[in-house]
């Protein structure tokens, strides 16, 4: 049990909690800390030489604060000193130790990036969700969203990030990368992520988002014609899938006022399932504030997205009043 500080006693008498503190308590309860620490442990410095390293769980908690609140390394360090809720979540007691500095957090983040540990966190969470019945098999919803990147050339290199590209969405030009996701059609939880430059069409990454046991795939009208693509036709499993793609509204037949428009009824039924893919995007963009890339290049941002979607899956599960225990 953690030692109580004067701040803990003072804050315990408050009449209400902030939304930030409530969110951190939800995540603290649902994250499988022992499993995540075990994933990091083989790659973490042993401390046999030099200064003893900070605890793995402490650094992981500090990194999660950075990811969830979209903070810089220095901003995360300052936030822990400023915010009681964040300090409590990380587990820092100023009577015993100071918060890890920005450089220590930077080295920890690079450790996660170098060994692709965020993907291991994501896969571990999804494996448990399948085993406990929270994520079912058989159906996937596919979609993609653009994450903006700085388009300016006013920097030391006088050029944009070469791994990002521009694309036109509607009447607006966007510059950045595109995040493609495959979502479980039953639960709305993300099971697969693919990251590409923004100019790659949504339909090009579809084959990588489909699971081996999927029988049905839902998508918006941007995925029309998916069943005719070479990578789909040439694959025995992918060619046998039922692709329920929404048609464009302009292609639907018009009927008289007194008749039932069955085309629209069918499209509405598809949309009622397909809309589940928008919920994870709302969490990472609106709750976690990840509307712009945090780093240069696709690899580092992909690593961050794995943690964001792992956290989004856990938050969605907790928000519905469930836990990682068996659903039945």
Could you tell me what each predicted segment is?
Residues 303-309, 313-315, 319-328:
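C-terminal domain-tail junction helix/linker
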Residues 1-34, 319, 323-328:
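Charged, often Cys/His-bearing segments associated with DNA-binding zinc-finger transcription factors
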Residues 49-57, 296-305:
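Structural motif
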Residues 2, 65, 74, 78-82, ...:
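Polybasic low-complexity intrinsically disordered regions
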Residues 37-45, 126, 281, 285:
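Amphipathic, well-packed alpha-helical segments that form the structural scaffold of globular domains
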Residues 16-64:
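Basic, short loop/linker segments at the boundary and entry of helix-turn-helix/winged-helix-like folds
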């Amino acid at each position: 049990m953690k030692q109580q500080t004067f701040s803990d006693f003072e804050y315990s008498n408050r009449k209400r909690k902030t939304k930030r503190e409530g969110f951190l308590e939800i995540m603290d309860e649902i994250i499988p800390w022992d499993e995540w620490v075990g994933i990091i442990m083989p790659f973490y410095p042993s401390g046999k030489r030099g200064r003893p390293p900070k605890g793995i769980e402490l650094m992981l908690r500090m990194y999660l604060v950075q990811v969830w609140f979209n903070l810089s390394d220095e901003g995360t360090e300052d936030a822990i000193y400023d915010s009681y809720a964040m300090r409590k979540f990380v587990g820092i007691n100023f009577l015993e130790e100071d918060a890890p500095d920005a450089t220590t957090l930077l080295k920890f983040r690079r450790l996660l990036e170098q060994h692709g540990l965020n993907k291991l966190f994501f896969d571990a969470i999804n494996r448990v969700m399948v085993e406990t019945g929270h994520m079912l098999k058989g159906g996937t919803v596919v979609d993609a969203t653009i994450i903006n990147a700085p388009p300016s050339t006013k920097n030391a290199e006088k050029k944009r990030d070469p791994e990002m590209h521009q694309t036109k969405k509607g009447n607006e030009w966007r510059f950045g990368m595109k995040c493609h996701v495959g979502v479980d059609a039953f639960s709305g939880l993300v099971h697969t992520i693919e990251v590409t430059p923004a100019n790659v069409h949504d339909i090009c990454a579809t084959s990588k988002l489909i699971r081996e046991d999927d029988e049905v795939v839902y998508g918006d009208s941007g995925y029309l014609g998916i069943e005719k693509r070479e990578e789909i036709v040439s694959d025995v499993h992918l060619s046998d899938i039922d692709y329920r793609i929404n048609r464009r509204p302009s292609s639907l037949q018009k009927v008289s006022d007194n008749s039932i428009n069955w085309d629209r009824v069918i499209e509405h039924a598809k949309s009622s399932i397909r809309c589940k893919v928008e919920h994870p995007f709302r969490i990472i963009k609106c709750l976690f504030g990840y509307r712009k890339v945090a780093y240069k290049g696709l690899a580092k941002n992909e690593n961050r997205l794995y943690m964001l979607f792992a956290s989004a899956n856990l938050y969605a599960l907790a928000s519905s009043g469930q836990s990682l225990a068996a659903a039945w």
